Amino acid sequence: MQIIVVSNFLSKRIEYFIEAGKHLQVEVRFMTYGELFNCLPQLRQAVIKLEPCVSDETNFLKYALLNQAYKETLQRLGEMRLSDDVCFLNTPHALLRALDKKETKQVLMDRGLKVTPMLPSPRSFDELRELLTGCGRGCFLKPRYGSGAGGVMAIRYQPNRNKWVVYTTLQQVDGVI
């Protein structure tokens, strides 16, 4: 049985996964999504671990396009027939569901797991300011769809200085973050 970890590029997380395999004396191979699509019809005796696409994109609009392409890749993989001795460690369908952070959080709460509180979605900065001022803490703003921390913005109000502090990985494009 072979173990294959798949993404568009190697990442530290994937390198750690491969290293863990070596520690267990199990070979773990890396493959790109393109390589997986090419070999999947003939692939036998394999467990496939799908990883999100690696990107250092800071333009939020381009990030959304990358996320859409990843969703389409997962949908395509989910429609392919696999040999009986090939399986996904994390199925394309499960990953598609997990890409919706709001739905995922609701599933976790429904199962009785403790999660960080989720504020209502503000429609303007004034609404966000009101929400944060009322709860007395900072928050992380994330896109609803996507994997990991991409597009995250940390924002906190400092009442003693009457100042808003924002940290982000996003870049300003045409005057808009």
Regions found by a protein language model. Give the residues of each.
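Extreme N-terminal starter segment of soluble prokaryotic enzymes
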Residues: 1-4
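A general, composition-driven signal for non-globular sequence regions
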Residues: 6-7, 136
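Conserved N-proximal alpha/beta basic substrate-recognition cap immediately N-terminal to
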Residues: 8-122, 126
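Short alpha-helical interface elements
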Residues: 28, 45-46, 132-133, 156-157
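ATP-grasp fold ATP-binding core
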Residues: 104-109, 132-156
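Catalytic core of tubulin tyrosine ligase-like
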Residues: 144-147, 153-177
